[in-house]
Amino acid sequence: MSQNDSGHFLISEENWSLHRKGFDDQQRHQKKVQEAIKNNLPDLVTEESIIMSNGKDVVKIPIRSLDEYKIRYNYDKNKHVGQGDGESQVGDVVARDGSDKKQGPGKGQGAGDQAGEDYYEAEVSLMDLEEALFKELELPNLQQKERDNIIHTDIEFNDIRKTGLTGNIDKKRTMMSAFKRNAMSGKPSFYPIYPEDLKYKTWNDITKPESKAVVLAMMDTSGSMGVWEKYMARSFFFWMTRFLRTKYETVEIEFIAHHTEARVVSEEDFFSKGESGGTICSSVYRKSLELIDEKYNPARYNIYPFHFSDGDNLTSDNARCVKLVNDIMKKANLFCYGEVNQYNRHSTLMSAYKNVKDEKFKYYILKQKSDVFQALKNFFRNEESGVSHQFS
């Protein structure tokens, strides 16, 4: 604090924008983290440490180091000449290295003589991944059903009153009311504030009906489904389950495992226990129809069946599968089939499903880990966006 010639005191004359430097750097860092998540999302979705975590673990991803701009000493010790006419723009080259660079950063088994880029590992939580992934997903073709007796309640501050709770005082309107009253008496000031100046924000309860929905998660657990195939299927269902429970309050999930026979299992068994035996996929479709008839009336529920298999089905069972899938689609909003086929081998089930022409039928073939992310985007995208059947 200093006193000038006029007798007034100055608190500070410095450029306060410089104090934002730390905040700006933090914002740049967060932006880089979000870019890294977006660029690595297909791989992060199938990261084993996340799939097998308790929801609280973190994963590390590489992010390019953010160095401050500054003049550096030229360790190559080459001569440079830089000149300009005073009209240089941001990004113009000031000087170029005159040396003939035939070497570069080391890569693979070759050794280089140039410095590489600095990277560091940033920790990313499961919540960060969910935020990046789920904003692109939604239940397609969600319809308003009969007898929707579950409502979602929200609160909206949309009214101002002269009485209310102390914690809901609208400071801006209160001070403006006091200023106007004081100005009318010839003393324009925010103070004093009298009880009649107080303004309180009040809210109204907003209710809206939400349509019920059920997702039938069906997974092939037969002997032909190896460790990698089951891991891919469970990775998809892991993210599907978290997505549904995060964005929809009224969605139920039924877990069905099958080999030659199908049975409804607990969520824990679905994600942990393996089985063996042959494959008869029609068994899981019959079980789905039984559940729909017993518990999920199509007039009250949006129905979304998801089936994951390796496609190695009993050949004589394929015709029954096609018939049952058509029966399910008459009651469901959508039918999604995911096939884990890493080596592009012949699939008896996929050969039969290629003849299904119903718009409700969608499939995706997963050949590598990043395809889990693509399958999620393909299945959980609104029909209005023009989704079609896709291969990886």
Swiss-Prot record:
Region annotated Disordered, chain positions: 78-115
| Feature: compositional bias, Basic and acidic residues | 94-103
Q: Check the record and name the InterPro entries matching this protein.
A: Spore_YhbH, UPF0229
Family matches, as Pfam families: DUF444
Alphabetized UniProt keyword annotations: Stress response
- Give the induction text: By phosphate starvation, via the PhoP/PhoR two-component regulatory system.
Q: Which domain of life is it from?
A: Bacteria
- Family assignment? Belongs to the UPF0229 family.
**What is the official name of this protein in its record?**
Stress response UPF0229 protein YhbH
Q: Which organism is this protein's natural source?
A: Bacillus subtilis (strain 168)
